[in-house]
Amino acid sequence: MQFTGKEDIEAPIERVFEEITDFQGFERSALRRGADVRRTDKLKVPGVGMSWHAAFKLRGKQRKVDVTVAEYDPPNGIKLGLMSPSIEGQMVAELVALSRGRTRMTVTLVLQPRTLAARLMMQSLRLARNNLTKRF
């Protein structure tokens, strides 16, 4: 299942890339919301191979996910791989400079079920696709 969203941002492409790759900020945000986030790589600078393990409660059930940076192309975009026991996927954020101070960001999320329960959940998502696409 695939979700895509586009947004034009009034900021230079370099600034937008800095914001979408503020990994420490995302870690702090997840921790404030009650998730347990651990960095699982030893890289000193941002790039391909960065990875995290996160555990959090969603809809009353404990969930776990591993996230890995699969592509890192400053300032054009980033690709993340997502792996959990029931779902795998990838998220791609592409940036295009429309002018010196304006950037178009396209985010694509592709999810694939790995278990029967995940297939049933994906079927529910397909039925609610229009509402989810509006929110995405």
Regions inferred by a protein language model and the residue ranges of each:
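Short amphipathic alpha-helical segments
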Residues: P12-E18, A128, L132-R135
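Hydrophobic pocket/interface hotspot
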Residues: V16-I20, F26, W52, V69, ...
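Hydrophobic ligand-binding cavity/cleft-lining segments
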Residues: M1-G47
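A short, structured loop/turn motif at beta-sheet edges
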Residues: I13, V45, E71-P75, E94-R104
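Beta-strand/loop substructures that line and gate deep hydrophobic ligand-binding cavities in soluble
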Residues: K79-K134
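Beta-strand elements of well-folded, non-transmembrane domains
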Residues: I9-A11, F56-G60, E71-D73, L95, ...
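Glycine-rich portal/gate segments that line the openings of hydrophobic small-molecule binding cavities
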Residues: R38-S84
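Short, surface-exposed coil-to-beta transition loops
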Residues: Q2-T4, Q62-D66, I87-V92
